[in-house]
Amino acid sequence: MEIHSKKIFSKVTKMKIISEAETIGCYSSIGSEVQTNDIINYFLNEGKSVSLPKVSQDEMTFRKVEDVSKLEKGEFDIPEPKDNTPIQENHDVILIPCIGLDNQGNRIGYGFGFYDKYLEGSGAVKIGLSYSKQIVKTIPVSKNDIKMDWIVTEKDVIKTS
């Protein structure tokens, strides 16, 4: 998994849309998700404005991050920015964790709908990070599901729209 995450890191950081982005939303990886600490630190070192999700009850906001070592465990035991961290309203790009994806950009998350609610109406470019083994032929979708614009795996960078 770590080797695949490093390959994904390399592909993400070479994307033109990433190099041109000033504000980037990412996520704190847990479990078997694509690991993001290296990606976050790379963005911070490049001088980009980076924010991570913070979940409170049924709402998710993105809050600015300057140092991943200062995150604290949140509602789902996921490292998050502290409550007093400024909210980042708009993003050029958001990197999104995916349990499953299809090549059309349909995504399976954890089933709570936090990302779909947050991304509704967002002008950010949505990039789903996933391992190639998690790409399937089709994902069932509902009217509230938000598609990814790009998918990045250890093998491919796929533009879906």
Regions found by a protein language model. Give the residues of each.
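N-terminal active-site beta-alpha-beta segment that forms phosphate/nucleotide-binding
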Residues: 1-87
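Conserved phosphate- and dinucleotide-binding cores of soluble alpha/beta proteins
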Residues: 61-161
